[in-house]
């Protein structure tokens, strides 16, 4: 399960909007919002976000326990 609040924080810390990250990972903003709502992203999408957002502790965000 993804910690969406922490991911939103990382997005904001980079001065970006969720729609910017949607474009980065190749989905529409609507699809991105749904993925955030459900807390589910593909491994390729996670990889891109880790790299593009310079996330230092991806385990804490993307591989959190419920």
Language-model regions, residue ranges each:
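Residues in the recognition helix of alpha-helical DNA-binding motifs
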Residues: 10, 24, 35-36
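A short, Lys/Arg-rich alpha-helix, primarily the initiator
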Residues: 1-16, 20
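Short C-terminal boundary/hinge segments that cap the last helix of small helical domains
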Residues: 54-66
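Key DNA-contacting residues within the recognition helix of helix-turn-helix
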Residues: 33-34, 62
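Short alpha-helical DNA-recognition segment
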Residues: 15-31
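The DNA-recognition helices of helix-turn-helix-type DNA-binding domains
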Residues: 28, 39-40, 65
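Short, basic-rich loop-to-helix N-cap that marks the start of a DNA-contacting helix
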Residues: 38-51
């Amino acid at each position: 399960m993804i910690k969406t609040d922490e991911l939103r924080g990382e997005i904001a810390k980079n001065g970006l909007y969720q729609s910017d990250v949607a474009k980065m990972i190749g989905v529409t903003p609507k699809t991105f919002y749904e993925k955030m709502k459900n807390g589910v992203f593909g491994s390729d999408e996670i990889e891109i976000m880790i790299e593009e957002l310079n996330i230092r502790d991806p385990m804490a965000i993307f591989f959190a326990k419920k």
